[in-house]
Structure formats: structure tokens, C-alpha cells
């Protein structure tokens, strides 16, 4: 059985403990039949001062996904609330995601991620596409798409990712052979975290970091610590106004800026090295995304650096966590794992000859990743600032309103996904599911690193499944915590046993 939340959730209003929160059912309030004004949208009101105290005390908002899930159960598929002067409308149905996409302009707007923006402003650095809006965003994005998202770009970096995935497999084999029991039981999360850094760095900068071995360099350890620290501090600062946290969270702000400084210095060094190699003409073959961007000269170096920082930071947890949760669910669902192994073994010859075949010859594995991201959406929610008026659930929503689309609640709605508590990859192969797989966003602002993440996950899972049986003694659900990304509050322990 997949996720069935059993954690106690403390809501800001009312302050009550909710036991055994269930998936959102079909008992939600139906949308009105005639068009209603914005003010008629069900309102979620909470005491903002009590909420601030709660966030300060808990150093974040780890149960955000559960809190919002319960509000949908109480108020229906749409509700509104305000944060300061900002009006926010929250939705969770695929039909509303489709409407958001239909009215999307050429310049879709997102809200600012204040902790990240504050670092760029303080250090005088440019912003990448994750932090930009308007014409500058579009200019950067169109030039990046060609080298990061396009099929031609994917074809170029797939062999690099496959090399790292195969090295991970060999390292895992070595550890298993060293164990007298002929198997290996471990918390795999940090190893997968290192894999995603290694693979992303190789695809971006054409450089291996050596993170799959036993002895990591001090520089590598510093970089890994900076990535962890950046995400942790982001979640601690995200839900409170800067005017407050500058006094209450000075240590956290320092940790946040220090972490970004390490990431910035790392990106600087990598880009300088790539630039020097290009000037010397030492590389005549494809050597990564950044080398292509510099060679084309369509973006200035500081813009390449800004986007490299964001791709580096954004391609780690968002890939490692789905890998962890997929392996855990396959360990709990051995029949699904067996079917995936048969698929991988049948496709091994074609994938060995051309690693890109993994993206087309493993449909059940692709479905398994969709099922993992249905249950454990790393981002938790998508957001758009409306550029024009829109009708959602027969309520008028004016232009300029911030709309949040909660993927966690969509994935647990039995009206959308029958038996949502079950891990059933086959559901994605039975029929087309429009606007139901949104873990990477939608439209022209979908995740820039989507294809890189998919390649990293597909290739590694293929190599693991054809070689190892993955097992776990744990049958209960893993509790998730919102720490800027949705991640396991404690990582599951898995056993890797060679396939006989």
C-alpha cells in the first residue's frame, strides 16, 4: 500500500489535532452552477500572528501539504486566503490546471522566491529563469530550451548521464560483494543525492566530481553541505516576511547567504574552466550544456552563471527524492518490481547500444515514475499570477491573483485517481490523463531541467532493476515533510540483493 497519512497535523484554525487524514474524497463542496463573484469563494481564515509564532517555533512549515489537504476536505476544491495584501486562490483539480494553461500568456508570472532573490540582490548577481519574470525571462528561456530541453540536446547529454549511472551500479556491486551476506542494507538517500549531483554536474559542465567513491574531497563535501544548507534555510525563511526574519532569524539568513556563496563560487570555477578549455580548443566533442551555451554566445557569461547556479541547485533533491521513493515503493510492491525488471531485461540490448532508448523502450518504468510523483510531488504545488481574469469552479478570479495548484491533494483525490492509496503504475498506461501528471509543471514555464531529471531517473532505475532485487522490512508509509521540497521525514532503509 502506498502513502496513507497518519501524522498528527496542527492547524492554525481551528487549533485541533487531526488523526488519520484521508485522501480527499468526492464529498467536497460542488462548484456553484452560476457564475459567482470572487468574494463568494470559500475563505480559509487563520490568525496570522498565531501562524507566524508556529512557523518560528517549528523553524518552517513541515506539514503545509497536510494542512492544505485538510482545508480542501473542509471547504471543497477551491478556497481563498490572504497573506498580507496578497490574495491567494488554491485549487487542486486537473480541470483547473487546464484552465490556467489555456489563459497563460507568453510571459507567465511566478511569485518571487524572496530568500533567493535577496542573495542575488545583496551580491549584485543576475537572476536565472527560475527567479525572472517578463521579457528577460522569455529571452533567457528560449535560448536555454535549445540546449537543455530540446530532443537534440537530450540526445547529446544522455551518454554522459548513462556513464554516471553505470558507475553508480558498479560501486553498488562492489559494496554488495564486500558484504559477507551477499546483500547490502543501507539508507540510500545520500548515495542517490551524490549520484544526482555527479550526473547533473557532468551534463552541465563536463566535469566529474568523484562523488560515487568512498573518500570525498573537502571541496566536494563543502559543496554538498552548501546544497543541504541552502534548501534547509530556504524553508525556514520562506513563509515569514523579511522585515521580521531579519531580526528573528539572523543566523538562518547568514547560513542561507553563505550556502549560496559556496554554490556561486563553484559555478564560477566550473564556467571559468569550461571557458578556458574552449579558448584553447582542447575539446572538439560535446562537453556539456554550459560549453554549448558559451560557444553559441547567445547569452552573456553572467546569465549563463545565473542559470547554471539554479540548474545545479534545482536538479539534486528534486531528482534524488523521487528515486528514493520509487525504490521504496517497488520494495513494498514486489509484483510491480518484477514486471519492471522483466521490461528492463527485455530492453537491455537496445539500451546498451543506445542509452536514449531507455526513454522510449521502458513505458512501465516511465509510468512508475509518474505514479511516484503522484504520491510524492517534490514541489508540492505550482503557482501562477493571473495575467487575465479567469473562471475557476464557476467563481470569477481577477487578473493579478496568485493561484496555487496543490499537486499533493490532486494525487490523493479518488475522483481523479481511483484507489489513490495504491501504488499502481499501470493506471498511467490504461488511458490518457490530461493535466494529471504535473510534477514538472506545464506550459512554457515547465521545469527547465525536466529532461535531465527524467534521464537521470530512468537510466539509474533501469540499471538497478536489471541487476538487483530491492527489498524492505518496512511496510508502513513514509511520512513526508515540506522543507521547500517535499521529502521523507526519515529515509527508508533498503536492501539490495543480486538478481539470481
UniProtKB/Swiss-Prot annotation:
Binding site for heme: 447
Main location: mitochondrion
One Gene Ontology MF term: corticosterone 18-monooxygenase activity
Catalytic activity: a steroid + 2 reduced [adrenodoxin] + O2 + 2 H(+) = an 11beta-hydroxysteroid + 2 oxidized [adrenodoxin] + H2O; 21-hydroxyprogesterone + 2 reduced [adrenodoxin] + O2 + 2 H(+) = corticosterone + 2 oxidized [adrenodoxin] + H2O; corticosterone + 2 reduced [adrenodoxin] + O2 + 2 H(+) = 18-hydroxycorticosterone + 2 oxidized [adrenodoxin] + H2O; 18-hydroxycorticosterone + 2 reduced [adrenodoxin] + O2 + 2 H(+) = aldosterone + 2 oxidized [adrenodoxin] + 2 H2O
Keyword Lipid metabolism: no
Gene3D superfamilies hit by this protein: Cytochrome P450 (1.10.630.10)
Primary role: A cytochrome P450 monooxygenase that catalyzes the biosynthesis of aldosterone, the main mineralocorticoid in the human body responsible for salt and water homeostasis, thus involved in blood pressure regulation, arterial hypertension, and the development of heart failure.
Protein name: Cytochrome P450 11B2, mitochondrial
Amino acid at each position: 500500500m502506498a502513502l496513507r497519512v497518519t501524522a498528527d497535523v496542527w492547524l492554525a484554525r481551528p487549533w485541533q489535532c487531526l488523526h488519520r487524514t484521508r485522501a480527499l474524497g468526492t464529498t467536497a463542496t460542488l462548484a456553484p452552477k452560476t457564475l459567482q463573484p470572487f468574494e463568494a469563494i470559500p475563505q480559509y481564515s487563520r490568525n496570522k500572528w498565531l501562524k507566524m509564532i508556529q512557523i518560528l517555533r517549528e523553524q518552517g512549515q513541515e506539514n503545509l501539504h497536510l494542512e492544505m489537504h485538510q482545508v480542501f476536505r473542509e471547504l471543497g476544491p477551491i478556497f481563498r486566503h490572504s497573506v498580507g495584501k496578497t490574495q491567494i486562490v488554491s485549487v487542486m483539480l486537473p480541470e483547473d490546471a487546464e484552465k490556467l494553461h489555456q489563459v497563460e500568456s507568453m510571459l507567465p508570472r511566478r511569485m518571487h522566491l524572496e530568500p533567493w532573490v535577496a542573495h542575488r540582490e545583496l551580491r549584485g548577481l543576475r537572476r536565472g529563469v527560475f527567479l525572472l519574470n517578463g521579457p528577460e525571462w522569455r529571452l533567457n528561456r528560449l535560448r536555454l530550451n535549445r540546449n537543455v530541453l530540446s530532443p537534440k540536446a537530450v540526445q547529446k547529454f544522455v551518454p554522459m548521464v548513462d556513464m554516471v549511472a553505470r558507475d553508480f551500479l558498479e560501486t553498488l556491486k562492489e559494496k554488495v560483494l564486500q558484504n559477507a551476506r551477499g546483500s547490502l542494507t543501507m539508507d540510500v538517500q545520500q548515495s542517490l543525492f551524490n549520484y544526482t549531483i555527479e550526473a547533473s554536474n557532468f551534463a552541465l559542465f563536463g566535469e566529474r566530481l568523484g562523488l560515487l567513491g568512498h573518500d570525498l574531497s573537502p571541496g566536494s563535501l563543502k559543496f554538498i553541505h552548501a546544497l543541504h544548507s541552502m534548501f534547509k534555510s530556504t524553508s525556514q525563511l520562506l513563509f515569514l516576511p523579511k522585515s521580521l526574519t531579519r531580526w528573528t532569524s539572523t543566523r538562518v539568513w547568514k547560513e542561507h547567504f553563505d550556502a549560496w556563496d559556496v554554490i556561486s563560487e563553484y559555478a564560477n570555477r566550473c564556467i571559468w574552466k569550461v571557458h578556458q578549455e574552449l579558448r584553447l580548443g582542447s575539446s572538439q566533442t560535446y562537453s556539456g550544456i554550459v560549453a554549448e551555451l558559451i560557444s553559441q554566445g547567445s547569452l552573456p557569461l553572467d546569465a549563463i552563471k545565473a542559470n547554471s547556479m539554479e540548474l545545479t541547485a534545482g536538479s539534486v533533491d528534486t531528482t534524488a527524492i523521487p528515486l528514493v521513493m520509487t525504490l521504496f515503493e517497488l520494495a513494498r510492491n514486489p509484483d510491480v518490481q518484477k514486471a519492471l525488471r522483466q521490461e528492463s531485461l527485455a530492453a537491455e540490448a537496445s539500451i546498451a547500444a543506445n542509452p536514449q532508448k531507455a526513454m522510449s523502450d521502458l513505458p512501465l518504468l516511465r509510468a512508475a515514475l509518474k505514479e511516484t510523483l503522484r504520491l510524492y510531488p517534490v514541489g508540492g504545488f505550482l503557482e501562477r499570477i493571473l495575467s487575465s481574469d479567469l473562471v475557476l469552479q464557476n467563481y470569477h478570479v481577477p487578473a493579478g491573483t496568485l493561484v496555487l495548484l496543490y499537486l499533493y491533494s490532486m494525487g490523493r483525490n479518488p475522483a481523479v485517481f481511483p484507489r489513490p492509496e495504491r501504488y499502481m503504475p499501470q493506471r498511467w498506461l490504461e488511458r490518457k490523463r490530461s493535466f494529471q501528471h504535473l510534477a514538472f509543471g506545464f506550459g512554457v514555464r515547465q521545469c527547465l531541467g525536466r529532461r535531465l531529471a527524467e534521464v537521470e531517473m530512468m537510466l539509474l532505475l533501469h540499471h538497478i532493476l536489471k541487476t538487483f532485487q530491492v527489498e524492505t522490512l518496512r511496510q508502513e508509509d513514509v511520512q513526508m515533510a515540506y522543507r521547500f521540497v517535499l521529502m521523507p521525514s526519515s529515509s527508508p532503509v533498503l536492501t539490495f540483493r543480486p538478481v539470481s
